[in-house]
Each structure stands twice: as C-alpha cells, then as structure tokens.
C-alpha cells in the first residue's frame, strides 16, 4: 500500500484474502504428520464460527480461547473474526485467578477450547470434531484483545482495532518479499501480537503455517531440525531466539536451507557474529527489523540484506510504515512536537491508523497513555529513539532504561554490542546497579562455551572493554550465566537482573552435591521444607530462579541446561543427571507432570537451556 487505507476498508485485508484461497489445493497448516489444506481449514473455521453464532456471539463480543498450539485453535481465531468478535487467547498454564480476571476485564462471553481453568459461569462452546461449514462474515470493531505481560498489578488488556490491524496485514500482503506465499513457522505464543501477524500474513498470501510444539520451541537444535525438515522459508523471532538459532547452527545444528526472510522484533536487534555468520551462509536472505509496541503493533521496519559484514552492530528500526505517524519529543515533554527534520533523540510518540482502541475496561489508563495533541491521537511509547533526516529511527531503549554513571549518560546497547564482538560471548546485557559507591554498570554474560572459567572470562572481557570503550563505559562487574532470564514475551528481563543482583546465596562447600543443590533451592524458594523429590515448580520456581540456580551451579563446576532443568523438575532427578546416573522413574513422571509448568515458561532458552 502506498498510503494508509483508513477506516473500515482496511478490515478487508483480514478475512477476504483467506477466503480467496479456498479453491486452492495448497496446504494451510502443518502440525507434525497432520496436513490441512486451505479448503479444509476454512471449512473447519466455518464450523466453529457457526457454533459461536449459535451461542449468541456476534459483532463486538469477546471470545476467550484456550491458546494451545493446535490447528483448531488457529481455526478458532479466524472463526472469531468471521463472527465480528475479538479472540482473547489465554495461556492455560497461567493461574486460574489470573485467567478469570482477564476474562472478566475483557468481558468474554464464552470460551472455546479445553484444558483452561475458567469459571463455570463462562459458557463453553463445543464443536464436533468432524464438523465443517462454509466460512462467511467479516471483521467487527476489534481484531483481538491481548493482555500485556507482567506478574503484578491488575492485568492490562490491549484492544486492537480491526482496521488498524488490517492496515498492517495489507502492508504485509503488498510487500515485495513478505507478501509472497511462504512456509512460515508459527513461533510466537498466541497471547502475543506477533502470532496474529504470522497467521494472517501467511494464510492471506496462500502460504503454509507450520505449528511448533513447546518442547521444540524451547530447544534451538530441535527447532532447527523442524525448520530444515519442513522447508521453512520465513521466521518471526525475538532477537534472543534468533541468536540461539544462529549459535546452534554454528555448533553443528541442522542448517535452515530454505530460509529467505527472518523478521525480528521485541527488543533491540544486535547483529552478533553468530547472526552474521548464519546470514553469510544464506545468500539472498533478508533480516527484517520491526518495531512496535502491542498498543500499535508494527509501525516501522528496516531491512538488512547483502554482505552481513557490512551490517551495523545495532541496526536501526527503520522508517514509519504508511499507516503510522511517528514523532520524537523531549523525554519530559508534555506536548507532541513534530519531529520533522530534527536529528535529535527523545521520546517516541506513535499516531496514525495503527493505534489500538485502548486498554479494555481501563479508561483512566487509556487516557494516560493515549493522548490527544494537535487534533490527533498519540500513544506514548515509553521508548527513546534517535531520528535521522530521512526519518530512519534508531532504538535507544526504554525511558526507564537510560543510565547515568557519575553524571555521564550511558547507552547500554553500545556496551552490549562491544561485548558481543568478543569471540567467547554469545549474549550480553548491561544493567545499572545501585550500591554504596553509587550506580555502577553490571554486565551479564552468556558464554559460547558453558565450560569456560568464569574468572578468566570476566578478566578477558574487562580487558576487551577497556581496549574498545571509553573508561566510564567499562562494566564494574561481570556475571556469567547459563542463560538470561526472559519475560513471557520472550524479551530479556532486565529489571529482574537488576532487582535480584543483591540476593546472596550460600553454597555448602564440602557437602555432597545432593545436599548442596537441595539447600540452594531451599534458599531460592524460601522453602525450608522442600524435599529432594518435590516438583520445584509446584513450590514457586520460575524462569529467573532457574537461571540463577544454574549459574550458581556452574560456578561450582557443574553444568545443567535450562531445558534439562525443566525436563527433570526435582532436585533428585537433576542430581542423578549431573552425576551421570539413571533418572528414576518417579523423576520421569515428574518431568511429564511438569509439562504444564514448562508451557508457562514458554521461553526460548539460549544454548544452555512480538513486537517490542
């Protein structure tokens, strides 16, 4: 599209392109050995839509979906759109109280799907497994409702307008590369906006969506095998997942021979040596860097092609898409001042046809973040950017991420890029830590080789930084991790790194490993009665705590991966694995019982284990 379509016309990019594929024999979905062609997929969506209509669902309603990774769930998303309703994907692994709160805030009228703990008062729509019907209808006012990540406070649901999302899908379908029919991996959890981008841009172009299991999603080697076996041509990945895949390829994982487009979003893109090496072996492939919060979805894009050696370490997030307006204002400004040719930096405001309706059921918060200025509506992104004369934007981090050390402003991304240039570094995150000496810089590192000595690596990195960075940019401390903690969105949890840096752990030197490991977990979970055979996730284990435990374990000469920690979620099973013995049957049963907890993890663990 050369310009934003605007208004109700943009909704035509949602359902009609899918319906246009009905007569084709092409495969719409693949999930393991199951293949579903376009016609069968649409008729299944039609049956679900008819069941929803029979339950009284119509335009403007909200439908809760159990967000499992199955063809029927994908069909249910399309069915909701056809009814004019908004799907509300809910992760069955979340606590029942949180699920109930989300459904209540969104005003969900019914729920579709099994295995989700919602109040009995919410009617369930059951669709016969063999039911099929012609799909008809069209999008209503909302395309979807998604609750943003966060473990405290009242849930915050973004209500995305159908015409706004339709603008993005229309841009995709008209794109010379992204608009082609492609075999696309459905990587993002359905509770995140990128999943809708994957779904509608793929099926609307006549492509094939390949569904991935959670175990494959968390394991980069298994994921590479799937990508190679299925001939996946397009990926949507957060930066941390792309890095993990690139590392796995370098370590001998299956090569993604058919890959031609990778779309990354969710956090600042680093063109690391591993990522460059991957694309150097994929001639003609393009790396697309997208930016956009859930409240607007994607609003800018930049393409990296050609020789990866020429790519900048921190690629820009690009220029505004046709349906978005972007302005840069002073970080403390109350008004939206047009960026124009200003080559400065500041707070990014987002406007245009891309904006969500707001936060469902929370008018005060909507008014706070979506503001009226100069006769237009703007979303206060909370992100800092730098703008070039041609409108190209560079992401500098969140307003809350800006650091000052001894009065000097510090950009963590610059330090992280320097660290990632070191041959032994797979990932790096730099955060500010407040202490007796004031605020200092702490570098958190995931090494390429998990067996590297921590002290030697920290010393080498300090020397490396001193040789390449200004003195005030050299981190004071270097922490070596098995993996970095991730939020549910797949982004690195920087706040968790800074918040938990001061928690001291006591390791019982000289004690048997089983006692040391159990004692460490009792400290982390504040659970003195924790038993060796107890499921750690039943006692509050979470992503950050797993990473901290494995990092401490590594300091004392033992290596356990994040994936193994989730596969064997008891101290006894993990110790058996570490000591090279057989894992007892009850440990394996615990591993099976831990599937629900691991689904909640829903992370892509880097090696050792949506739009921004």
Locations of the language-model features?
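Regions immediately C-terminal to embedded phosphopantetheine-bearing carrier domains
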Residues: 1, 5, 81, 142, ...
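AMP-dependent adenylate-forming
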Residues: 1-4, 12-15, 111-135, 165, ...
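AMP-binding/adenylate-forming domain of the ANL superfamily
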Residues: 1-110, 114-123, 128-145, 160, ...
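Phosphopantetheine carrier-protein modules
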Residues: 26-27, 31-35, 55-62, 396-399, ...
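Conserved AMP-binding
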Residues: 67-70, 91, 178, 188-192, ...
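Conserved pre-ATP/AMP-binding loop-to-beta segment of ANL
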Residues: 131-147, 154, 178-184, 190
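Conserved AMP-binding/adenylation subdomain of ANL enzymes
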Residues: 156-185, 193-233
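Gly/Ser/Thr-rich phosphate-binding loop
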Residues: 204-207, 232-234, 246-316, 325, ...
